[in-house]
């Protein structure tokens, strides 16, 4: 009788214990342009996101020193897997907004990620802010995005102020090295938030550096002709040209420069279209000599050896396309978001928001040339640095800062008539 009583008591106690919790899978809404003029950017970013999910969900890459590479799934969510719901904004801000709403209300995603175009990120993130869902941005560079007082928006990469400061410092360092002085600059830019912010910052930095702005030329994004803009630049004849363009515009800008024999001594581009692999595929060796701020160059492999293996894996998925400055930032950003969700140990928005605020990733766990990832109160990563590349033989070579450089800057850019 006593044994029966003890057994009954034991069974009753076991019934009171909570059942083993199942793995908590995580669904993230990913908003990029998968059609339209910048579709290739979106496709490359999809490959970057899928590579991160493979790193997180399997142990195939456990030898890589990356967050979550050594485990299968999210360990703090019982091995839960990460999946993505991809949405196409086509480069349209209003579509980015509606897709963000759909992903949150219908797809029930845990967080949002995207969206490349600053103008689209601006609208899509207003939805996540209103609905209190974390939004991580990896590559949109308008400074205004982290100056809105938002509590649910986080950006891992530098903004245009950081990037532009790096480009102007690269020019100052070149002046010292060559014992010369630039006098004039010109800015030309597409007419959305990205271009307007970029040109504003460049003009402010030019004034501080003592450079005169001799031309300020906006153009309509997606323009079919840039002849008049190039003729104005040719007449102004600046020492340095600062273009801010998406891919199709960057291609047209260079082709028109060649057609009209416009020969700037230095071209210092604001990333985006000028570092998209589709750009050099379209223009070939005509790209040689162009400089751009960037976050990736194969020259970084010397400082970060694991980058070669990761880039090789990325190339398998893209049909031979290397990481670009934007796709590598997408890779890092999505990994940061997955790491934060794991540290949150929950799919609740408030827990993920808190984990993002506490992010403090060291540089050795990144494939970008940053000092780490740590967000300020505005959601901006404060441990970012700029890199400047130059096309040489159709390859993006790191030329600044000098401690990361893999090549000397070619200066001035050879005139069209001098090229072979």
Indicate residue ranges for each PLM-predicted region:
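Extracytosolic ligand-binding ectodomains
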Residues: 4-11, 17, 22-420
């Amino acid at each position: 009788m006593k044994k029966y009583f003890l057994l009954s008591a034991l069974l009753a106690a076991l019934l009171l214990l909570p059942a083993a919790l199942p793995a908590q899978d995580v669904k993230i809404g990913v908003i990029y342009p998968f059609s339209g003029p910048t579709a290739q950017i979106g496709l490359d970013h999809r490959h970057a996101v899928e590579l991160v999910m493979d790193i997180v969900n399997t142990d195939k890459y456990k030898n890589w020193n990356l967050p979550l590479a050594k485990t299968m799934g999210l360990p703090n969510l019982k091995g839960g897997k990460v999946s993505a719901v991809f949405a196409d904004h086509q480069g349209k801000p209003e579509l980015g907004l509606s897709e963000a709403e759909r992903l949150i209300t219908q797809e029930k995603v845990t967080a949002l990620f995207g969206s490349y175009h600053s103008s689209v990120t601006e609208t899509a993130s207003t939805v996540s802010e209103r609905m209190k869902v974390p939004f991580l941005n990896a590559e949109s560079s308008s400074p205004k995005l982290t100056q809105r007082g938002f509590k649910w928006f986080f950006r891992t990469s530098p903004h245009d102020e950081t990037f532009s400061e790096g480009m102007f410092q690269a020019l100052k360092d070149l002046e010292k090295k060559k014992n010369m002085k630039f006098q004039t600059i010109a800015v030309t830019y597409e007419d959305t938030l990205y271009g307007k912010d970029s040109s504003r910052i460049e003009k402010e930095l030019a004034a501080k550096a003592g450079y005169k702005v001799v031309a300020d030329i906006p153009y309509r994004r997606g323009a079919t002709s840039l002849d008049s803009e190039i003729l104005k630049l040719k007449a102004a004849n600046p020492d340095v040209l600062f273009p801010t363009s998406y891919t199709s515009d960057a291609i047209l800008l260079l082709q028109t420069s060649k057609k009209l024999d416009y020969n700037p001594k230095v071209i210092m581009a604001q990333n985006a279209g000028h570092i998209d692999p589709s750009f050099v595929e379209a223009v070939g060796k005509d790209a040689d000599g162009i400089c751009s701020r960037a976050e990736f160059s194969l020259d970084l492999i010397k400082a970060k050896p694991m980058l070669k293996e990761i880039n090789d894996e990325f190339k398998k998925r893209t049909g031979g396309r290397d990481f670009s400055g934007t796709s590598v930032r997408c890779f890092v950003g999505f990994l940061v978001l997955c790491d934060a969700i794991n540290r949150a140990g929950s799919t609740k928005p408030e827990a993920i928001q808190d984990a993002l605020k506490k992010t403090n990733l060291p540089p050795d766990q990144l494939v970008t040339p940053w000092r780490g990832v740590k967000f300020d109160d505005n959601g901006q990563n404060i441990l970012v640095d700029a890199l400047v590349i130059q096309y040489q033989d159709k390859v993006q070579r790191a030329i600044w800062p000098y401690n990361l450089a893999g090549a000397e800057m070619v200066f001035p850019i050879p005139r069209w008539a001098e090229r072979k």
